[in-house]
A protein has these predicted regions:
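Redox-cofactor binding/interface segments in oxidoreductases and associated redox assembly factors
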Residues: 86-87, 106
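Short histidine/acidic/glycine/proline-rich micro-motifs that form metal-
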Residues: 44-46, 91, 146-147
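Short glycine-/acidic-enriched loop or helix-start segments at secondary-structure transitions
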Residues: 23-25, 51, 92-97, 116
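Short glycine-rich anion-binding loops that position phosphate/pyrophosphate groups of nucleotides
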Residues: 19, 89-92, 111
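Alpha-helix C-terminal capping/helix-to-coil transition sites in glycosyltransferase folds
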Residues: 78-80
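Phosphate-binding/catalytic loops
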Residues: 95-173
Length: 173
């Protein structure tokens, strides 16, 4: 990304099933990106449906879900991505090489669908995922993308993947 595109930055979020984490990240970035970013999401092994708790957590957080079912990478490999961000370890391992040399980063998040326990505990896990994704995306949006060289930008985008629930949503860069 040596030059600033004349279009919004394109971001692809990847996870295994495209049923929770990547869908959540896509919805949040599209809500907060202010037209500067356009996000999509996909899975390496798409699930049959989006987890209803992911949709509920987004809705109750005031974020509109895109409404698309889980999908794979078909039709997405030839798009001109500026950023490809994996949000689960399995997707990181299976992440293909995209044309155009996008900035690739890993923002691993626990799978909220793996949480066991009662309904409230499961629901809380999805809200925690929305909170963590929102914090990371806020940091991402604070990066001065127009002023950073590709290598510096890639380093900073990757570092966002280390942000935890306990850190503030935005910090000086």
């Amino acid at each position: 990304m040596p030059t600033i595109p004349s279009r919004p930055f394109r971001v692809l979020f990847l996870c295994t099933g495209n049923s929770a984490r990547s869908q959540i990240a896509e919805a949040i970035l599209n809500r907060l990106g202010g037209g500067r970013f356009v996000a999509e999401s996909a899975g390496s092994q798409p699930a049959a449906r989006v987890n209803p708790l992911a949709i509920e957590a987004l809705r109750e957080s005031g974020i509109t879900w895109a409404g698309h079912p889980p999908r794979g990478l078909d039709g997405l490999m030839d798009k001109d991505w500026d950023f490809v961000i994996t949000v689960c370890d399995k997707a990181k391992e299976a992440c293909p090489i995209f044309p155009g040399q996008p900035v690739v980063a890993h923002w691993g998040m626990p799978d909220p669908a793996d949480v066991e326990g009662d309904a409230e505990r499961k629901r809380t896990a999805f809200f925690d995922t929305v909170t963590l994704a929102s914090r990371r995306i806020s940091l991402f949006l604070a990066l001065p993308t127009e002023k950073l060289a590709k290598l510096a930008l890639e380093t900073r985008v990757r570092a966002i993947g280390e942000v935890t629930m306990d850190e503030p949503a935005a910090r000086e860069g």
